[in-house]
Amino acid sequence: VGSENAKVGETWWFALPVPTNTSAEPIEITGVSLVQVPKGIEVLRYGAYSLEDTEGLALLAKEGDDWTPRFAALRDHSGEPLKVAPHASSDIYYLAQLKITSLPSRSARYCEFDYRQSGRAYTQTLDCEVELTGK
């Protein structure tokens, strides 16, 4: 996913993969991050929002656009572990708030999820990618 119209100074929201638990035991997600962030992109923060509140998955959205959810007015669930039931997908998903500080030369890639299951801590890295380029 990406945009060829990014400009220095803009802020974008990029959705990480929707948390899905394929195991038979519940999990609690305790943290998320983008692993490879190129020069030119600064991660301001990570938020966790309801699919219902954002009226679906806001895969990539420029802050301030008419169609972009008003994240500041929505409940951010990132302050607490996110519980995902066995064999289920979450109705809460994570987004990275990204600031363009200079035009990036490459994509931001790989999403890391920290979680607990049955008293043990795990980290899982999933493939995800956002490319923000401009002229």
Describe the role of every protein-language-model region:
Residues 1-135:
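Non-catalytic macromolecular-recognition regions in eukaryotic signaling proteins
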